[in-house]
């Protein structure tokens, strides 16, 4: 039996309990051997002022420390060129055994935007796609995805077979926490305790991150 590896990408600016709860639920539901949180690279002009990619990575490392099955994959931040998901998948897949299963977790909104992604039709050559559905999400996928869904979608998440190639949907009731809200609270000098893991809070406070400029 091959290993079951999940990839969960995000800007994690900062990583918060909503991300962590989704990660733990997915690792359990899909019986993953490992779920890698994958901080996404951004052009320097899109980074939050005063918070570097290295600091976003450091927060994720602290969030997953000691959490069974959760790890960090920093490869997108270590590239010196634009970071496309297909490049990441090819690079991860090249390190795995042929029978290892790779699951890429993405949100509904990201999934609906899939046809705009670089070489999007090749994504399923390397992984299964698990779409996290929210109860409040618009439930009709765009026209451009209908054929793909008809050919590749599997109703039962437990029925995904082989190293990749299929799409399934998982319902999650996400915690009402957002990175935008957390940045706003910190900018206003307010507490974000219990919205981020304690180790992340300690790092934010030690490095004075997300503070309003004085």
Curated annotation (Swiss-Prot):
Disulfide bonds: none annotated. Signal peptide: none annotated. CDD domains: NMNAT. It is an enzyme of class 2 (transferase). GO terms for biological process: NAD biosynthetic process. It catalyses: nicotinate beta-D-ribonucleotide + ATP + H(+) = deamido-NAD(+) + diphosphate. InterPro entries: Cyt_trans-like, NadD/NMNAT, Rossmann-like_a/b/a_fold. Pathway: Cofactor biosynthesis; NAD(+) biosynthesis; deamido-NAD(+) from nicotinate D-ribonucleotide: step 1/1. Its EC number is 2.7.7.18. One of its GO terms (molecular function) is nicotinate-nucleotide adenylyltransferase activity. Keywords: ATP-binding, NAD, Nucleotide-binding, Nucleotidyltransferase, Pyridine nucleotide biosynthesis, Transferase. Transmembrane segments: none annotated. Belongs to the NadD family. Catalyzes the reversible adenylation of nicotinate mononucleotide (NaMN) to nicotinic acid adenine dinucleotide (NaAD). This is Probable nicotinate-nucleotide adenylyltransferase. It comes from Pseudomonas aeruginosa (strain ATCC 15692 / DSM 22644 / CIP 104116 / JCM 14847 / LMG 12228 / 1C / PRS 101 / PAO1).
């Amino acid at each position: 039996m091959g290993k079951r590896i999940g990839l969960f990408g995000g800007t994690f600016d900062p990583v918060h309990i909503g991300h962590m709860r989704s990660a733990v639920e997915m690792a359990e539901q899909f019986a993953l051997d490992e779920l890698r949180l994958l901080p996404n690279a951004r052009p320097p002009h899109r980074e939050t002022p005063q918070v570097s990619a290295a600091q976003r990575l450091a927060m994720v490392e602290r969030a997953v420390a000691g959490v069974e099955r959760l790890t960090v994959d920093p490869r997108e931040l270590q590239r010196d060129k634009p970071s496309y998901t297909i490049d990441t998948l090819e690079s991860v897949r090249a390190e795995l055994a042929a029978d290892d299963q790779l699951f890429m977790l993405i949100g509904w909104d990201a999934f609906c935007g899939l046809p705009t992604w670089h070489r999007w039709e090749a994504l399923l050559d390397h992984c299964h796609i698990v779409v996290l559905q929210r109860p409040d999400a618009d439930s009709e996928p765009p026209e451009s995805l209908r054929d793909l869904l008809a050919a590749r979608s599997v109703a039962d998440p437990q029925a995904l077979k082989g190293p990749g190639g299929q799409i399934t949907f998982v319902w999650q009731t996400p915690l009402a926490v957002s990175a935008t809200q957390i940045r706003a609270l910190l900018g206003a000098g307010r507490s974000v305790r219990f919205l981020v893991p304690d180790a992340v809070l300690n790092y934010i406070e030690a490095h004075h991150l997300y503070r309003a400029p004085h």
